[in-house]
């Protein structure tokens, strides 16, 4: 049957100069869907989990640090003056970083033409951008406490240093989520002991990690979920507490603080190191799994809290919305902070299917950095290969 020719196609844009093969639905009405697809909300995770102080004026805040003393027995006739030990004092100072701002300009003509509201969402996004900057700064300061050079890594000698815990395998070997989760749990066991050895209070301990590491912990605990009902909620995919640490999922773990430009890291105030091994850097973007701390490890000083300001820009016929705050962030207690990082050693290669001789198996490459556990595993593999070769030879002779 022949195709119909002619007939009205009202949706097609048939104006002068328009190609006939244009959109056949172009002229039909686009109905507002009733919902604006705004960006997902970003939530600050550090605000309630570290020390925050407010000042009414000035450029910085002082945090005095006191050391410890020791008791000693006093025998008859001895003088206390001969045994006295001075309690050392020092201080930590957090300086206000400056006035951090985010703003948007809404032109009257565009606002009049628009058929949906944008002001509330713009306001939310401005506030979120400042919250993310504060989060990034606090997390970068935790990493900073782990990277301080040895002559400055304690507030007062004897109070303790930051703890950096390596996994027993390197990053390339921990692609399995369950294996990674077990490594993180084992590291948190060591972290718990390290903080307790520094007399850090058991309460208010937090472990910040990215979504991959958070999911890995869940995967490691899931097979025994019934036994860990107090720790995880498999239905919601959430973790409450592991080894005394509140586990917090942070997508922006290594973002760092704000800079002098809206795009990129130009003039960034609190930088999260990019690469391990540069100077004293032990914790960086390329090896960090998570950061742990007590709430007193890092501090924030507020000169002006988060505020919103609306201004009329008559010369542009527009309204301006400004979000701003004046804060400073800094590390306070190295002994109450630490990080879990991937092992920096070279990964063992996959065992060859060709049986090696005992002499060959006993040779360890000077290029490989092996832990005792890896050395034992390699020896067991070599012994197994030797036995299989001997068995195959005996079978062939028969």
From Swiss-Prot:
Record's compositionally biased regions (Polar residues): 362-372
Region (Disordered): 359-398
Biased composition (Low complexity): 373-382
InterPro entries attached to this UniProt entry: Capsid_Gp10A/Gp10B-like_dom (IPR049301), Capsid_Gp10A/Gp10B_dom (IPR039009)
Claim: Coiled coil is one of the keywords in the record: no
GO BP field: viral translational frameshifting
Subcellular location(s) of the protein: Virion
GO cellular component: viral capsid
UniProt entry keywords in alphabetical sequence: Capsid protein, Virion
Record function comment: Assembles with the major capsid protein to form an icosahedral capsid with a T=7 symmetry, about 60 nm in diameter, and consisting of 415 capsid proteins. The major and minor capsid proteins are incorporated into the capsid in about a 90/10 ratio respectively. Once the capsid formed, encapsidates one single copy of the viral genome.
HAMAP family: CAPSID_PROTEIN_T7
UniProt family annotation: Belongs to the T7virus minor capsid protein family.
Subunit text: Interacts with the connector protein and the major capsid protein.
Miscellaneous information on this protein: The minor capsid protein is produced by a -1 ribosomal frameshift near the C-terminus of the ORF coding for the major capsid protein, producing a protein with a C-terminal extension compared to the major capsid protein. The major capsid protein is produced by conventional translation of the same ORF.
Stated name of the protein: Minor capsid protein
Source species: Escherichia phage T7
């Amino acid at each position: 049957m022949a195709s119909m020719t002619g007939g009205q196609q009202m949706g097609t844009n048939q104006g002068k100069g328009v190609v006939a093969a244009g959109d056949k639905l172009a002229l039909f009405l686009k109905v507002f869907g009733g919902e604006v697809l705004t960006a997902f909300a970003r939530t600050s995770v550090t605000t309630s989990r570290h020390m925050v102080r407010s000042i009414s004026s000035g450029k910085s805040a002082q945090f005095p640090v006191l050391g410890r003393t020791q008791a000693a027995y006093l025998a008859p006739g001895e003088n206390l003056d001969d045994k006295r030990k001075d309690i050392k004092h020092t201080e930590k100072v957090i300086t206000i970083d400056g006035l951090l701002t985010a703003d948007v300009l809404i032109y009257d003509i565009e606002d009049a033409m628009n058929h949906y509201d944008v002001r509330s969402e713009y306001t939310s996004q401005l506030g979120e951008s400042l919250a993310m900057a504060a989060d990034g700064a606090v997390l970068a300061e935790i990493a900073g406490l782990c990277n301080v050079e040895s002559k400055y890594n304690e507030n007062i000698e004897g109070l303790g240093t930051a703890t950096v815990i390596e996994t027993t395998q390197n990053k390339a070997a921990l692609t399995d989520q369950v294996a990674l989760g077990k490594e993180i749990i084992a590291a948190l066991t060591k972290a718990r002991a390290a903080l307790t050895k520094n007399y850090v209070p058991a309460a208010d301990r937090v472990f910040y990690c990215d979504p991959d590491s958070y999911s890995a912990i869940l995967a490691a605990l899931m097979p025994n979920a019934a036994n860990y009902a107090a720790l995880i909620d498999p239905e919601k995919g959430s973790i409450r507490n592991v080894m005394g640490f509140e586990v917090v999922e942070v997508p922006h773990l290594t973002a760092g603080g704000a800079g002098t430009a809206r795009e990129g890291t130009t003039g960034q105030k609190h930088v999260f190191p990019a690469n391990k091994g540069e100077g004293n850097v032990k914790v960086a973007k390329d090896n960090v799994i998570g950061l742990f701390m007590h709430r007193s490890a890092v501090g924030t000083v507020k000169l002006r809290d988060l505020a919103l300001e609306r201004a009329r820009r008559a010369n542009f016929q527009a309204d301006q919305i400004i979000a701003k705050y004046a804060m400073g962030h800094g590390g306070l207690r190295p002994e109450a902070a630490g990080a879990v990082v991937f092992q920096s050693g070279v990964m063992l290669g996959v065992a060859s299917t060709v049986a090696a001789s005992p002499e060959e198996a006993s040779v360890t490459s000077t290029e490989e950095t092996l832990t005792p556990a890896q050395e034992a595993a390699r020896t067991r593999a070599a012994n197994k290969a030797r036995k299989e070769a001997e068995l195959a030879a005996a079978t062939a002779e028969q």
